[in-house]
Amino acid sequence: MSEVNVPLSFSDAAASRVKALIAEEENPALKLRVYITGGGCSGFQYGFTFDERVNEGDTTIVNSGVTLVVDPMSLQYLIGGVVDYTEGLEGARFFVNNPNATTTCGCGASFSV
């Protein structure tokens, strides 16, 4: 596990929502894990899940007392990005503002580099 300054940001809006969800679950050990998988209409897609574990090699980013966890393989695609949260007409969701993405699908859930 490394806790260093990495060029990946965890927005205040995302941290606030994670904090609220953790409180609902009544499990302060939970962390938000962001990861990249193959798939989607553009080649790669983002995934978000809650995880109690931080694996060897994972990078952690802390904001407002909550932790974002990223595995080393996913981190290489997320450098310079911002993990954020929005609520709007399309619903509420976590998303990544990713400067490495050369194309994205219409909903923003998948991308290519």
From Swiss-Prot:
Q: Does the keyword Iron apply?
A: yes
Q: Which UniProt keywords apply?
A: Iron, Iron-sulfur, Metal-binding
UniProt-recorded Gene Ontology molecular function terms: 2 iron, 2 sulfur cluster binding; 4 iron, 4 sulfur cluster binding; iron ion binding
Gene Ontology CC annotations of this record: cytosol
Its required cofactor(s), as named, are: iron-sulfur cluster
The UniProt subunit note reads as follows: Homodimer.
Family statement drawn from the similarity comment of this UniProt entry: Belongs to the HesB/IscA family.
Q: Protein name, please? A: Iron-sulfur cluster insertion protein ErpA
The species this protein belongs to is Vibrio campbellii (strain ATCC BAA-1116)
